[in-house]
Every structure is written in C-alpha cells, then in structure tokens.
Amino acid sequence: YGISPAATRVSGDERWLAEASTADAGPGMSAGGAASTPGRAAIGQQTDIYRFDITSPGPPRFVAGGRVPGYLIDQYALSEWHGYLRVATTTGTSWALADGPPADAQTSSSAVYALSTRGPVMRLAGHVTGLGRTERIYSVRFMGPVGYVVTFRQTDPLYTVDLSDPAQPRVRGSLALTGYSAYLHPASDTRLIGIGRQAD
C-alpha cells in the first residue's frame, strides 16, 4: 500500500495505520461530519486511518478507511473499544513544533473523535473539541470507556474524557499541573501513572 504511518496499532486480529495527510477529504474517506481543513499547507492537518485484517497468512487485507482532522502523537492516540475507534488529535501548528511563535498558534487545540468501525467507511459517531487551546497533545491513554489526554504549553492539563456514549463524548474533569506527562500508564482501573518533566 506504500503507506508511511504516523502511528500503528495492533488490536486482536486487526492492524490500524494512521498517516498524516494534507489532501482534501475524498469520497469514502471523510470522517462523516468532522471538520476538516482542505487545502491546508501545514503538515499533518488531517490524518487518514486504515484498518487491515491480519488473521490470514500473506498480505494484510484492507477492511476500512476514515479521516479525522489534525495529527496523532503516537500509537496510544488510537484505541478500539466496543465497535468504535477513539482517536485523539491536535489541529493547528503547535508553538512547540516551529522556530518561534507560529502565526496560528492561538488556534491550535486538540480533540477526541469516536469513529464507528462498522462498514468499509469509518463514520464519525461523536467528538469533543477545544481541548488545550494554544497547546498540543503530549500524551494519551484510553482505558475502557475513558480517555486521558495531556496537553501542554505552560501547565499540564490532564483531561478526563467520558466515552461511554460514543455519540456524545464529554470532558468529565481536568487537572492542571506544572510540567507535563510524556507517558501515561494505567496502574489499575482507578489509578493512572504519568511520567514526564517539571516546568519552571
């Protein structure tokens, strides 16, 4: 398929590949209602997601595709749960990814999307946007129906996103700390460990 994935994730008998894209949303690849940024010059303003079946010997079999706005930080920004793929992305050029303050730094923000995995096109079921305005995602972890998203610029807001209803995700709470967590690890169903750096 000639894909250079920004993130890859294996879930059971399936593999997910996410590739940063600047192309206009084409037929059969739209996230089904999620805002996109066609014609955008910045790298990674959209992410194409491909689902492959890896149960049989030989090459993986393409199953479905979808698209969401923004870019993924790593494989933990993807998670399948009960027929839905949860994806955490940042849109806008982050202040931390350019030399000096970018012109659109004030518009950068993050979001979590829930895509239905039924059918050849992954359609948008629901989303929550506006996380960490002027910031970018530093770490993500999904644990069952809950997603944890860390964004950072001067403080580290840890957002708790309730995804129990994929059609209506909502922010359940947030915790602001100095510094940021670059890695989140589930210690139990009720405990999350964050590893990162302290900020002055």
Predicted regions and their residues:
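Beta-sheet-rich non-transmembrane sensory/scaffold domains
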Residues: Y1-D200
